[in-house]
Design a protein with these regions (language model features):
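Juxta-kinase regulatory segment immediately upstream of eukaryotic protein kinase catalytic domains
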Residues: 1-25
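ATP-binding pocket architecture of kinase catalytic cores
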Residues: 31-187, 195-204, 217-219
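All-alpha amphipathic helical-bundle segments outside canonical DNA-binding/catalytic cores
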Residues: 157-158, 283-294
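Catalytic-loop of the protein kinase fold
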Residues: 204-206, 211
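Activation of the activation-loop gatekeeper triad in protein kinase-fold domains
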Residues: 226-231
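Helical subdomain adjoining the active site within ATP-dependent kinase catalytic cores
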Residues: 282, 286, 300-341
Length: 341
């Protein structure tokens, strides 16, 4: 590995693999930059002076069981390529961890802006901000309308008992990353487990749907939905609830989470939910349970990132404040369920 290579990506070995499996794709010496802003899988923009691609691989060090599955990401963007959901072109999947030290996949580079802050949106004006937020919701509706079997994803997950399995999965991953006491986390889990709603029609779900996981083109349309590592078949309201949870960042004082939803012109939570419900035709009457579950899930994800940070296994800046937000997520998740009574 050359000293100029980014952490976790040997460019010489990557080039050799691409030459062997996609002859003619690469024309010159590869360079790479780590994409900042991600908190889980590592993302690199790789170029040869003529073309650019994106490479994704799992994080360095401690990796949670069932998480960071490159095969799932590659499979879902391959399946969605010819649907109304905009995704990059899937180019190559490598399941041989010996090539660069972990599984990875290569996809096309898509032009677009990942808006992350209210200041970025404020520069566009209220009208454009509203248009982008509406496009975000509409793209989610489009995703949930895709027939999984028609795009080769009929066996992508097991929607029966999805919510119960999700609770077990995230509790297991919490236990795998537990390195400190987290007051209220057991109460939140138990409250959720005692009141699991009956799911409606299942769909392909993204698992981490939010504004800074999409690219927006110059016409304020979504040019690509990214970061599919938690996608599966399941209850689509989990996607909507996570979008709502991210929009309520101010209630939990998470300064490291995108504050884009506070930009002038961005629709309120009620407006987002109403637009989704009207366009999808889905029943959102029990959304509070899903939002509480979203806070539980976020708490587990961030605790895993905090654990890797304390072990020195994160790449890039901005991880030092992640752990402080976990108790706030737990507290707000419990408050939402108590409001239901």
């Amino acid at each position: 590995m050359n000293p100029t290579d980014p952490p976790g990506l040997d460019l010489d070995r990557l080039r050799a693999h691409l030459d062997a499996h996609r002859p003619g794709l690469v024309a010159g010496e590869l360079t790479a930059d780590v994409v900042e802003g991600g908190r889980s899988n590592l993302t690199y923009v790789v170029g040869d002076g003529r073309s650019r691609w994106v490479v994704r691989r799992p994080p360095l060090g401690h990796v949670l069981p069932t998480a960071h599955d490159m095969t799932r990401e590659f499979r879902v963007i391959s399946g969605l390529r010819d649907t109304a959901v905009p995704v990059p072109e899937a180019i190559l999947l490598c399941e041989d961890a010996d090539v660069v030290g972990a599984q990875f996949y290569v996809m096309s580079f898509v032009e677009g802006t990942p808006y992350r802050t209210a200041d970025e949106l404020a520069q566009l004006g209220e009208g454009r901000t509203r248009a982008i937020a509406d496009a975000l919701v509409d793209t989610l509706v489009d995703l949930h309308a895709v027939d999984p079997a028609a795009v080769g994803l009929g066996g992508f997950g097991r929607p029966e008992g999805f919510l119960e399995r999700q609770l077990r999965r995230w509790k297991k991953q919490l236990d795998a990353s537990r390195s400190r006491d987290l007051d209220g986390i057991e109460e939140l889990h138990d409250r959720l487990a005692a009141a699991v709603p009956v799911s409606g029609k299942p769909s392909i779900i993204h698992g981490d749907y939010r504004l800074d996981n999409v690219l927006v083109d110059s016409g304020d349309e979504i040019s690509a939905v990214l970061d599919w590592e938690m996608s599966t078949l399941g209850d689509p309201l989990t996607d909507l609830a996570l979008l709502v949870a991210y929009a309520e960042r101010d209630k939990v004082s998470l300064q490291f989470v995108s504050n884009a939803s506070s930009a002038p012109g961005y629709p309120t939570t009620d407006e987002v939910v109403r637009r989704y419900a009207e366009r999808s035709g889905r029943d959102v009457s029990q959304l509070n349970w899903y939002v509480s579950f979203a806070f539980f899930k976020l708490a587990v994800i961030l605790e895993g990132i905090h654990y890797r940070y304390t072990q020195g296994k994160t790449v890039g800046a901005g991880f030092e404040g992640v752990g402080a937000g976990v108790p706030l997520l737990i507290s707000h998740g419990n408050e939402i369920l108590k409001e239901e009574k």
